[in-house]
């Protein structure tokens, strides 16, 4: 197994007085896609906004605006991944509590792809 070669305690101490992330990454909540590990970044290097299916609502957009407009991040990256459970659930028409509203925001993208690639 690979091990993290960073001194996390030191990074926590170094960033305790403030942060200056150069980028904000919007990614899915999928546990297999840890942003900092995927890009070999340490604590304080990037803002990470995570939401199932990479859905942007006012709160997520406000977080991204904070990262860039207030904290000075210069880059925005949207990180997708394969076999996304939220996309699969939207394709299957899953309805369950609050996830129903979230999945409804994925459906227009699914319709666009289906129109581009009819079976």
Regions found by a protein language model. Name each.
Residues 1-20, 43-44, 53-74, 85-119:
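Divalent-metal-activated hydrolytic enzyme cores
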Residues 32, 84-85:
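Solvent-exposed loop/turn segments at secondary-structure junctions
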Residues 27-32, 52-55:
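Short glycine-enriched loops at secondary-structure junctions
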Residues 76-82:
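Ordered, amphipathic secondary-structure segments that act as subunit-interaction surfaces
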Residues 20-24, 28:
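Glycine/small-residue-rich phosphate/adenosyl-binding loop
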Residues 25, 49, 78:
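Divalent metal-coordination and catalytic microenvironments
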Residues 32-49:
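Catalytic core of membrane glycerolipid acyltransferases/transacylases, capturing the structured
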């Amino acid at each position: 197994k690979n091990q993290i070669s960073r001194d996390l305690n030191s990074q926590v101490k170094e960033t305790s007085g403030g942060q200056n992330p150069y980028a904000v990454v919007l990614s899915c909540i999928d546990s297999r896609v840890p942003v900092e590990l995927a890009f070999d970044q340490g604590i304080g290097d990037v803002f990470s906004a995570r939401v199932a299916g990479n859905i942007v609502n006012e709160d997520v957009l406000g977080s991204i605006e904070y990262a860039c407009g207030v904290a000075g991040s210069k880059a925005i990256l949207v990180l997708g991944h394969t076999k996304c459970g939220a996309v699969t659930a939207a394709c299957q028409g899953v309805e369950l509590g609050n996830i129903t509203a979230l999945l409804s925001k994925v459906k227009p993208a699914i319709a666009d792809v289906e129109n581009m690639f009819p079976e």
